[in-house]
């Protein structure tokens, strides 16, 4: 399943390349938990879905000011 994820577009929104996998993993975990609560047992690629949501701006980086201060 290729969702056509453009990592450069994600980098423009998140700035820090090491934050992107953390955000995607947390969102993927949330998506999986939501599906389990709904009783959906279908296998999905939750990380790809989360990366696509990040690319499309559906999820955003919280505390970007804190990240900026830590990087200095």
From Swiss-Prot:
A biological process term (GO) from this entry: DNA-templated transcription
Molecular function GO terms recorded: DNA binding; DNA-directed RNA polymerase activity
Any Pfam family the entry gives: RNA_pol_Rpb6
Keyword Transmembrane: no
Catalytic activity line of the entry: RNA(n) + a ribonucleoside 5'-triphosphate = RNA(n+1) + diphosphate
SUPFAM superfamilies: RPB6/omega subunit-like
Enzyme class: transferase
InterPro entries: DNA-dir_RNA_pol_omega (IPR003716), Pol_omega/Rpo6/RPB6 (IPR006110), RPB6/omega-like_sf (IPR036161)
Keywords, alphabetical: DNA-directed RNA polymerase, Nucleotidyltransferase, Transcription, Transferase
E.C. designation(s): 2.7.7.6
Coiled-coil zones: none
One CC-aspect GO term: DNA-directed RNA polymerase complex
Function: Promotes RNA polymerase assembly. Latches the N- and C-terminal regions of the beta' subunit thereby facilitating its interaction with the beta and alpha subunits.
Annotated family: Belongs to the RNA polymerase subunit omega family.
Oligomer status and interactors: The RNAP catalytic core consists of 2 alpha, 1 beta, 1 beta' and 1 omega subunit. When a sigma factor is associated with the core the holoenzyme is formed, which can initiate transcription.
HAMAP family assigned to the protein according to its UniProt record, in alphabetical order: RNApol_bact_RpoZ (MF_00366)
Protein name, entry field: DNA-directed RNA polymerase subunit omega
Gene that encodes the chain: rpoZ
């Amino acid at each position: 399943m290729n969702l056509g994820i453009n990592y450069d577009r994600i980098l423009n929104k998140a700035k820090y390349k090491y934050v992107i996998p953390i955000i995607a993993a947390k969102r993927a975990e949330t998506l999986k938990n939501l599906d389990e609560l709904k009783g959906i047992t279908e296998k999905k690629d939750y990380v790809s879905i989360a990366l696509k949501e990040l690319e499309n701006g559906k999820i955003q980086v919280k505390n970007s000011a804190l990240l900026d201060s830590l990087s200095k």
